[in-house]
């Protein structure tokens, strides 16, 4: 299957993505939006994630004659020259860039519209983009929070008993950021999450309410959620579907956050799969997407 690196103009330099083409030029096009932090277009991260879910997904879609473009966010990886300081990026900037990709792809190819597939935090970006883009076929929300990200972050921190000594400080920081206030003093263990340089971005994304955004989406929506996701839960999928009753909801058993099948309830095996690039995507992931994109 053919792969091609694409570039479009960014604010200061190019934004970059990878096109994987199906056989038919007029086949549907899916734009894959990465999740939080330093997640690249393959779905990998220097923080230990090597499962490559986006690359595997692109290959599986192409095998079913669906084109895809998976992108690097501005300031990171192939899009690092798009902005001098990636810490100055706000959530709305990512949505603007996705809108620019949609316009480029819709003008470039034979598709009248583009599907957005957002994974995790990328689902929030997809929802934000859908508020203003008029050239979307629909949304595919994969492991997407159904509540503001501050609530998700609280739950993630509280679920790990090792974090208990840090929780008073962490909860105070989250509350301040929710109110639009920065926090100058952050203890060393919490620096990776809350260092002052990223607080502006966190303030911007904590203001995003996915339930309110999805209510404004007129086109088709697929909500795809695994039961063994350690970061986003089936309750999030239910919250999104309640706000968008005509959405298609697929809950996949034993599927985790990086879209791999894992033994039910086995946290260690679940976490190990994050580094297993040769582990295929879980059965049902691609099938659910194809059923919506190519009904």
Model-derived features: positions:
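N-terminal cap/lid segment of alpha/beta-hydrolase-fold proteins
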Residues: 1-25
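Short, surface-exposed "cap/lid" segments of acyl-processing enzymes
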Residues: 25-61
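Conserved alpha/beta-hydrolase
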Residues: 52-80
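Alpha/beta-hydrolase active-site loop
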Residues: 86-107
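Short beta-strand/loop motif that positions the catalytic acidic residue
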Residues: 217, 223-225
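Catalytic active-site module of serine/aspartate enzymes centered on a nucleophile-bearing elbow/loop
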Residues: 255-259, 263-295
């Amino acid at each position: 299957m053919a792969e091609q690196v694409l570039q479009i103009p960014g604010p200061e330099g190019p934004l970059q993505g990878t096109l994987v083409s199906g056989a038919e030029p007029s086949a549907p096009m899916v734009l894959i939006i990465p999740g939080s932090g330093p997640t690249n277009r393959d779905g990998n991260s220097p923080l230990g994630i090597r499962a490559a879910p986006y690359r595997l997904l692109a290959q599986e879609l192409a095998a079913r004659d669906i084109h895809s473009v998976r992108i690097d966010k501005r300031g990171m990886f192939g899009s690092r020259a798009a902005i001098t300081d990636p810490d100055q990026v706000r959530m709305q900037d990512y949505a603007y860039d996705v809108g620019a990709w949609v316009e480029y792809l819709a003008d470039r190819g034979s598709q009248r519209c583009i599907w957005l597939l957002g994974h995790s935090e990328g689902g929030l970006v997809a929802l934000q983009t859908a508020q203003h883009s008029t050239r979307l076929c629909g949304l595919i929300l994969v492991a997407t929070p159904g509540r503001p990200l501050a609530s998700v972050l609280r739950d993630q921190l509280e679920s790990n008993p090792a974090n208990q000594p840090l929780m008073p400080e962490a909860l105070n920081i989250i509350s301040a950021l929710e109110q639009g206030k920065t926090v100058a003093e952050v203890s060393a263990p919490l620096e990776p999450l809350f260092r002052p340089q990223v607080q502006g971005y966190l303030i911007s994304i904590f203001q995003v309410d996915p339930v309110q955004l999805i209510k404004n989406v007129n086109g088709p929506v697929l909500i795809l959620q695994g039961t063994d996701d350690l970061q986003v839960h089936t309750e999030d999928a239910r919250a999104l579907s309640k706000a968008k009753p005509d959405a298609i909801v697929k809950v996949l058993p034993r599927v985790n956050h990086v879209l791999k099948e894992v033994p039910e309830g086995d946290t260690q095996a679940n976490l190990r799969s994050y580094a297993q690039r040769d582990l295929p995507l879980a059965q049902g992931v691609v099938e659910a997407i194809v059923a919506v994109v190519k009904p």
